C-alpha cells in the first residue's frame, strides 16, 4: 500500500499529487476545521473556488481549490480515482505531459464551475481527475492502445465516469467541474492520440 505514496520511475507525479492533497486535508484537520466535513467558510478562507471572489482578481483559486476537499469521503474517493487512472496513464505519457494535462484540465474545470454556478463554494481534485479520465477515454475510443488493454479499461472508465456524473445530480457535487474536466481532457486526448499511438508503436 505504501508504494503508492512513494514517487518512483514511471510513477512519479501521481504519488506527489496524492501526497499534496492529503497534506492539505491533514493541515485543515489539525487546524481544527473538522474531519468528516469542512464548513464552506473555512474552505473559502483556504482557497476554494467561489465566483464572486475568483473573478474579482483572486484567479489563483482556480488552481488552489483542486488541492482541497470538503471532507474525508470526498478526498478518499478522489484519491482512489486518481490512483486508478494514474497507474496506467502516467507511465504512458511521461511526467511532463501527465502533469500538464492534470493541471490544465483542473483549471478548465474550475472555469466551468464559475461559469455555471454564481455562488457555490467549490473544492476538489475531481475536475482534474475527470480530465485524466476524459483523456483516457479518448485514447481508448481511438484505439491508441492494444485491443486487449483497451477493452478492459474502456468499460471500467465508462462505469467510473457514468457513476460519478449520476452522483452529481444528487446535490452537493460540482458536476460543472466534472463535465468541464471530462470534456477538456477528451479534447486534449483527441489532439494527442495520433502522436501517442506513434510513440507506443516505436517503443514496442
Show where each model-derived region lies.
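Alpha-helical transmembrane bundle and helix-membrane interface signal
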Residues: 91-95, 138-154, 194-203
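Alpha-helical transmembrane segments of multi-pass integral membrane proteins
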Residues: 119-121, 125-150
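Transmembrane alpha-helical segments of multi-pass membrane transport proteins and ion-pumping complexes
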Residues: 29, 106-110, 114, 132-135, ...
Amino acid at each position: 500500500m505504501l508504494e503508492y505514496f512513494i514517487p518512483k520511475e514511471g510513477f512519479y507525479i501521481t504519488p506527489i499529487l496524492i501526497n499534496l492533497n492529503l497534506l492539505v486535508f491533514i493541515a485543515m484537520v489539525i487546524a481544527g476545521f473538522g474531519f468528516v466535513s469542512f464548513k464552506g467558510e473555512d474552505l473559502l478562507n483556504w482557497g476554494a473556488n467561489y465566483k464572486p471572489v475568483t473573478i474579482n482578481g483572486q484567479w489563483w483559486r482556480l488552481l488552489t481549490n483542486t488541492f482541497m476537499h470538503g471532507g474525508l469521503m470526498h478526498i478518499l474517493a478522489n484519491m482512489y480515482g486518481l490512483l486508478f487512472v494514474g497507474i496506467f496513464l502516467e507511465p504512458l505519457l511521461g511526467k511532463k505531459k501527465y502533469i500538464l494535462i492534470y493541471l490544465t484540465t483542473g483549471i478548465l474545470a474550475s472555469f466551468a464551475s464559475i461559469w455555471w454556478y454564481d455562488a457555490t463554494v467549490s473544492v476538489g481534485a475531481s475536475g482534474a481527475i475527470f480530465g485524466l479520465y476524459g483523456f483516457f477515454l479518448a485514447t481508448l475510443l481511438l484505439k491508441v492502445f492494444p485491443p486487449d488493454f483497451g477493452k478492459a479499461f474502456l468499460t471500467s472508465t465508462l462505469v467510473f465516469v457514468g457513476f460519478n456524473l449520476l452522483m452529481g445530480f444528487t446535490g452537493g457535487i460540482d458536476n460543472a467541474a466534472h463535465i468541464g474536466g471530462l470534456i477538456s481532457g477528451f479534447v486534449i486526448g483527441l489532439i494527442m492520440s495520433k502522436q501517442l499511438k506513434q510513440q507506443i508503436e516505436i517503443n514496442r
